[in-house]
Amino acid sequence: MSTRDSARFSSLPLRASASITVSGLDPPLADTSRLCKLAFAMPSSPRPVRQRLTSVLSLILLCSLLPGSSFASAYNGRPKLIVVLVIDQFRGDYLERYRDQFGDSGFRFLLDHGAYFPNCNYNYANTSTAPGHSTLFTGAYSNGHGIVANEWWDQKKKKMVTSVEDDDTKLVGVAGDKPGASPHNLMGDTLGDELKLATQGKSRVFGLSLKDRGAVFPAGFAGDAAYWIDQQSGAWVTSTYYRNELPSWVQDFNSTRPAKYWDRDWKDAQGALLASTAHRKAKDGSGAGFYEVVGPTGFGNAYEFEFAKELVLYENVGRGPATDLLSISLSPNDMLGHQVGPDSPEMKQMALDLDRQIAEFINFLGHQIGLADVWIVLSADHGVASLPDAVKKLRIPAANLDARKLEAQINGAITAKFSAGHPAAYVKLEYPRAWLDEDAFAAVHIREHDAEAAVGEAMKQAGLRDYYTKSQLAEGEAPDTPMGHKYLNSYSPEGSWYVMGVPDLYTVGSSKGTDHASPYTYDTHVPLAFYGLPFQAGTYRTSVEPVDLVPTLASLLGINAPTHSVGRVLTEALAPAHHTTGPGEAKP
């Protein structure tokens, strides 16, 4: 049974003819049906009882005169806009760790006035950016949507390729003839795709991120646009999959906005310097670029939100005849977290900065659209391990492993077994997963099952705890345990032969810093929160999964869940309702 904290109705943003400042926000007031609910949830005050009763009775009288103002129908109709905030590498414990230091209008606004699920965990081992975003927007795990990693071995090209690169498309927004990106590797459709189908294309769907994969998968197959940045210049780009040229507003943004973020000092609340972009800039095209310099600072998230606001304004997002969907994948947390770990002062400051930036964006949405017409969802694609050096100080086993040395060790073991005296690159290791070159094994007459088993044993000898081969997972050969199920959910039939290594606790495949991509809670635990009129405010301590996000939204929208969705509708957090408008149609 869920535990629900009491909701503080008194500070919910509203929308009417007057203007009320609430919890540091000043959005236009919400619809009058929410105002009627407040008549029965007004906080105590020092005013005389008679005066307070008069105010309440006046509100009740007002409600009785309003059409369609019954309390149970407070959220009749669809929202004009759904915003999904995906914070890259944001562990589920961060919200509780820093809750007392957050303001009232950012994270705490969503937690206090939304449905908050603090016990949300991915039920698979592929805890990386591409699989995480795919899972959030398809409602499926890798065995459904097909995305198992950020990149993998392409047997035809004989090289590693990214999850979204598409040679049939071109990049738009930068000089040259570079390959573009698309969701062509997805095996299932997304929430945005189903929204498009239900509204005959009237809904508009956008994805943005500093990373291509963080923008492309949320936008889905039918998305109107996905935008990410050119890593050198910071300019926003897209792909010919979506359009052949950038809109004029994006071109204007690129001509002036990136320059604002160079030459800036990132400081903590006491004014102490955390990082300076001034000494690392490379505006001339040489050396470190925008992604590396500005990305892993609090300015990276500010840059994304600035672009998101422009997109809402110039594309009239939330102002069409049907519900629009906007995904904002905030990449800087991941870019910084790999370097300094989750317990560093820098990560704390980024969380505090992000709290303020989210508050500003919520305020923006309130003014532009009205929060009564907006649903906001907060989650993350994965967590991260603490720095192994810090873990070891507490006598907990941990290690930094050099993935390239491990790869050489595994290839050496396979060479000794199958082609002694004739070294070959049998394996490409993307820790903890090994991709096998099928041609190399074919040259020594080794079949898939035997090749994968040999690589798995070599991985154990190199220091991994255990392994699962692609062949094993295809046959469902995994223990009937929670951990076994995680690896079955991590399987995909697509791509070349592979072996999934099971890492030891707090053991990462980088010689310094930290990483993710494990089945352990520090990687699987992420936040999940919903804000909007359909959601009963409170904290729900049931165990939930990120796959529950899209079926919950789809049910409320009256549309089909994505084709491979396996999640459940989080009914415990939903308010009752009388009737609705048509599927996906925004209320007038």
Task: List each model region and its residues.
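Short, structured active-site-proximal loop/turn typified by the sulfatase FGly-forming signature C/S-X-P-X-R
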Residues: 95-144, 204-208
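Active-site His/acidic residue clusters
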Residues: 216-225, 284-292, 296, 311-312, ...
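Long, well-ordered, tryptophan-enriched scaffold segments
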Residues: 223-307
